[in-house]
Amino acid sequence: YITNLNGTMNVINKIKTKNFIFASTGTAQDCTSAYGISKRAAEDVVREYCTKHKQQDYTIFRFYNVIGSDGFAPTNPDGLMYNLIKAKTTKEFTIFGDDYNTSDGTCVRDYVHVNEICDALKQSIEKPSNSIECLGHGVGKTVIDIVNMFKEVNNIDFEVNVGPRRKGDIESSVLANVSPYMRNLYTMDQ
């Protein structure tokens, strides 16, 4: 909490720019975790500071479930894509919870490609919104949807195990209002 809040305050006080772009998270919307609460507080700092210093525009981006590849192995060992890539060699994958109130019992997420995030950031440099912009598609996919898609695209098969729910996982995280900065450059099939 302190890192996000104090770090944001230090950066915004030191950097003198006409357009401040802040990277937040979709979890700031519902504040269901300490991380989400800390990012929401940091968003408030950005908005208050930039509003009081009227010469400074801002855009706050709430990133939803960012996916995509840069040619290197993903670095989040808890992330879905990291574990799917790992399953190519281990030949097994674990889904955490299959008893959610969703179409197949697994969590639903709104995935957005990292290149779409970059595109939105570039647009905001040219035209800041002075508001919070949520980056997602407004369309959810279940974990099983993603696992099956991954298997099909990579023409592989592996065992899928079901483990207990992870602490803090929410049933569904799908964006309701899609930002105008989202150009829908990719679909999940891509």
Show which residues each predicted segment covers:
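Structural signature of the Rossmann-like NAD(P)-dependent dehydrogenase/reductase core
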Residues: 20-24, 59-65, 110, 134-136
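Conserved cofactor-binding/catalytic machinery of classical short-chain dehydrogenase/reductase
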Residues: 7-10, 19, 41-42, 113-116
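Hydrophobic positions on the long internal alpha-helix
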Residues: 7, 11-15, 46, 120, ...
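C-terminal substrate-binding subdomain of Rossmann-fold SDR/epimerase-dehydratase oxidoreductases
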Residues: 86-190
